[in-house]
């Protein structure tokens, strides 16, 4: 969810709506309205504006292991040339769900969820390494997910 604006200004009501949805994405608009002093319709409109602006998403977060995906990994990618172009190509790969351009040992980090090790190897060898500009990859296989939260607040 790349942001379209650099620093959108949110009022306290919008921030509270976001925080309430971070706690429970299924919370009703009428419940949120009671908490922030707005009507259900006003909350619905604010949520729609926040999602349309790319400020937030409301999604179901699944446990990949429960769905049959046995391998999760972060792939560090070193690049020559325009990192943004390579990152766009990597982001277009369906099996990759998270791509960031970084400053440090790797130019790009990509998070993947695969069915098994064979699927992971195929993804790296057939989809990532052939991209023009990819110099090398290093894969960090997740042994155990210790913590994953999405409630970092709104400042």
Q: Where do the language-model regions lie?
A:
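A compositional/biophysical signature of low hydrophobicity enriched in polar/charged and small residues
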Residues: 1-155
